[in-house]
């Protein structure tokens, strides 16, 4: 995809470098023009980093955070007039600075402090230490496996999405999930620390209503960006539907996306179900690639999206353009399966495709993250500031989806539940079945069900706090990764 600055064009290498700085994620997780504008941006970022205090204490870290925020924060003219001396940590000071934007939903924790190592590991590959599954809470506060990562320890032990966790052995014998929840057991107690070799026993109810007992150990794993393989869903008398379950916009997702698009193109698929229900976003460069693959043939060289900075940094506003790849598909209709865990880069892709092709949402409304962050590193320290620095609009300069894409009134949403008890592509799974129905009938079911968010992100006195309010770094809202 080509990137222009004030009508100019950047090389693919420069775009790749910019992508390292730009992040689009909900987090605990964007004919050739002169490159001098881009070089100016990189130089400015380098100067800003090198000119800040190098000491790593909280006092100077707060000064550094304030300096960067006043210069680069998207709404820098709305920062709260607070005294850094009133706050014990730089994160607390940052929260206070951005409180006016948190209150109205524009920045509810999207700006945060982390470390360079944690940040880079999260958004280059998504690697972490764990069992290799994501859990979610369903009806009656039951705990289900929402997703199991291929080739991870849980997958190798036979665990699959839809299995219900009945009991956990934390080292002192099995205890029921209900008992663990009622006594407020912590996440670390139930699933153990993020340490290689940590073992837990699980008793689960499988898809045949039989009890499966397994003991598994944590390992370092890198969840595949695409769940299983791209699939063709047969339809009697019609061309098949292409199904893709896309987990995360990490650097490791580029080749799988290209391969999936090539597969669909060779099969002549025109109707698609793109499952983004747990995709909280990621890197701008991967959103770039996905848009080219999905929309490059429809809108080659037309504007795809626009990054808008604050008035002080307006020189760095940038348009992106669709570009046709040899693997780009020829779509007629897209159904995107979404939840409140669908955010940021996922929303960018949907919003940018909408002016060019028929798009419908199935599930529940999206998160509403219409902004992206740059990464700022404190010199000589391990601190990295992820700061909301630009707003994301589509090629027609339409955005503003701070309460979700459907809430803008510009998208059709067919209400459906995320049925944690069934596999993703089970025709009886409500979201998948509704998506197929829309492609068949061209309309939402006549009597849509009442959709509620997963219990794990609603209030419930029966659940421990860590399930009610999962840290943003763990991915999709309401679904814990273990």
Whereabouts are the PLM-identified features?
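Alpha-helical structural motif
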Residues: 16-18, 61, 427-432
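P-loop NTPase catalytic core of nucleic-acid-dependent motor ATPases
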Residues: 274
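C-terminal "post-core" interaction segments
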Residues: 237-244, 248-271, 279-482
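Bacterial N-terminal signal peptides that target proteins for export
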Residues: 3-19
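Flexible, low-complexity junctional segments that flank or bridge functional domains
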Residues: 32-271, 286, 451-482
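N-terminal signal peptide c-region/cleavage motif recognized by signal peptidases
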Residues: 27-30
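Short, hydrophobic/amphipathic alpha-helical patches that form generic packing surfaces
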Residues: 24, 63-71, 433-437
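Short intrinsically disordered, low-complexity coil segments enriched in acidic
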Residues: 1-2, 356
């Amino acid at each position: 995809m080509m990137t222009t600055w004030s009508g100019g064009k950047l090389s693919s290498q420069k775009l790749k470098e910019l992508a390292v700085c730009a992040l689009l994620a909900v987090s605990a997780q964007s004919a050739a023009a002169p490159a001098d504008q881009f070089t100016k941006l990189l130089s400015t970022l380098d100067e800003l980093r090198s000119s800040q205090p190098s000491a790593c204490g909280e006092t100077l870290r707060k000064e550094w955070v304030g300096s960067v925020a006043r210069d680069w924060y998207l709404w820098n003219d709305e920062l709260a007039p607070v005294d850094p001396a009133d706050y014990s940590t730089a994160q607390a000071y940052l929260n206070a600075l951005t409180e006016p934007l948190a209150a109205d939903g524009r920045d509810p924790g999207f700006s945060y402090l982390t470390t360079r190592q944690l940040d880079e590991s999260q958004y280059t590959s998504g690697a972490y230490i764990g069992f290799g599954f994501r859990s979610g809470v369903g009806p009656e506060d039951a705990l289900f496996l929402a997703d199991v990562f291929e080739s991870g320890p849980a997958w190798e032990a036979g665990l699959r999405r839809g299995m219900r966790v009945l009991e956990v052995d934390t080292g002192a014998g099995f205890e029921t999930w209900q008992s663990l929840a009622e006594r407020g057991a912590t996440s670390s107690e139930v699933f153990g620390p993020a340490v290689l070799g940590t073992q837990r026993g699980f008793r689960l109810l499988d898809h045949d209503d039989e009890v499966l007992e397994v003991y598994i150990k944590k390992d370092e794993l890198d969840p595949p960006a695409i769940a299983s393989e791209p699939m063709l869903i047969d339809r009697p008398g019609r061309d098949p539907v292409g199904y893709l379950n896309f987990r995360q916009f990490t650097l490791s997702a580029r080749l799988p996306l290209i391969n999936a698009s090539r597969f669909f193109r060779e099969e002549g698929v025109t109707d698609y179900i793109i499952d983004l229900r747990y995709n909280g976003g990621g890197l701008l460069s991967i959103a770039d690639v996905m848009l080219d693959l999905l929309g490059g043939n429809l809108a080659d060289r037309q504007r795809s999206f626009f990054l808008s900075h604050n008035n002080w940094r307006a020189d760095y506003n940038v348009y992106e353009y669709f570009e046709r790849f040899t693997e780009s598909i020829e779509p007629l209709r897209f159904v995107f399966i979404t939840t409140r865990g669908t955010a940021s880069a996922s929303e960018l892709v949907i919003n940018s495709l909408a002016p060019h092709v028929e798009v419908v949402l199935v599930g529940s409304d999206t998160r509403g993250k219409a902004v992206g962050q740059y990464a700022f590193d404190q010199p000589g320290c391990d601190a990295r500031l992820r700061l909301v620095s630009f707003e994301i609009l589509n090629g027609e300069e339409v955005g503003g989806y701070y309460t979700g894409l459907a809430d803008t009134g510009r998208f059709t949403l067919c209400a459906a539940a995320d049925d944690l008890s069934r596999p993703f592509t089970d025709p009886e799974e409500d979201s998948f079945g509704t998506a197929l129905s829309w492609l068949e009938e061209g309309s939402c079911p006549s009597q849509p069900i009442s959709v509620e968010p997963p219990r794990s992100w609603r209030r419930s006195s029966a659940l421990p706090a860590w399930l009610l309010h999962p840290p943003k770094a763990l991915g999709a809202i309401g679904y814990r990764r273990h």
